[in-house]
Amino acid sequence: MKYIRKNGIKDPGSAITHGIALILAVVGTLPLLLKAAREPDHLHVVAMAVFMLSMILLYLASTVYHTFDVNGKVNRRLKKFDHMMISVLIAGSYTPICLIALHGRTGIALCALVWAAAIGGILVKAFWINCPTVSYTHLTLPTNRE
């Protein structure tokens, strides 16, 4: 899909919405971490930090990818990074659920499984950016529901 360029931005709608989400994620990080720090278990801070970092990385990658149109090689790398960060955010979203809500061995085991699947998704997108959605989804279960 070709986008009409406005002010030199490759995809203004996505660049703006993801840029706003990036700002909100950065602004929301400190209050969330301060709230987590009030909990007696320090695992809350770790889990929330992982979640917030994964969200910041996704929106940063997406904002950069949708904003700049440098050249073919750079654009392909930005697209790969943008797509890889989807797996990171999904695993980052599971992390607080696994470590806080489920806690214990079950939570840790599920968290490890989810992050292993996310690493699989990252590797698939790193080496096969245009892989069919069906193949990608099966390779990265349980983290991806594209």
Residue ranges and their predicted role:
Residues 30-47, 94-110:
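Helix-coil boundary and interhelical linker segments in multi-pass alpha-helical membrane proteins
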Residues 137-143:
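Conserved small/polar residues in nucleotide/adenosyl-binding loops
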Residues 18, 62, 83:
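Divalent metal-coordination and catalytic microenvironments
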Residues 62-75, 120-131:
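C-terminal ends of transmembrane helices
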Residues 12-13, 72-85:
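Juxtamembrane helix-capping/reentrant segments at transmembrane boundaries
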Residues 14-31:
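The first (N-terminal) embedded transmembrane alpha-helix
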Residues 100-105, 125-134:
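Membrane-interface helix caps and helix-loop-helix hairpins in membrane proteins
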Residues 1-8:
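Short, Lys/Arg-rich, polar N-terminal cytosolic tail immediately upstream
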